Amino acid sequence: MGMNEDPVLTLSLIASEDLSTYQYYGVVMTTTDMNCERVDGTTDHPIGILLNAPASGEMALVGVIGVFPVKTSEAVACNAQVLIDSDGLGAPFEGDTDTTAYCIGTCIRASGGTSGEKDLVAVNCCNPFKGEE
């Protein structure tokens, strides 16, 4: 059975670093207008998922709202909430313990749970939220 994976909202930004090996990783805005870089801390506020593989200075296509592949660092079950970890990879979000991380969406198709695989995640980076104690 097929699934519509068309994005609802994407942004064209500028890669402020070489992102050529980070397709399907989480990205954040930098302090420079219209620039993005890979998430490198769980407290980073992700803007979306990198959908292409640009070198530094090239156009980065970023998925903000929609259903996107997300590379994961560990198994993420279907219907689990997802965060972007300190390596820019998706991981399970536990709202009561991940109090400094942002939930970016819900896994709608699990990959099988091997690190570096792509799970399919319904992403809403316009409205990510932090966990609560």
Model features per residue range: what roles?
Residues 1-133:
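Surface-exposed, low-hydrophobicity beta-strand/loop segments enriched in small/polar/acidic residues
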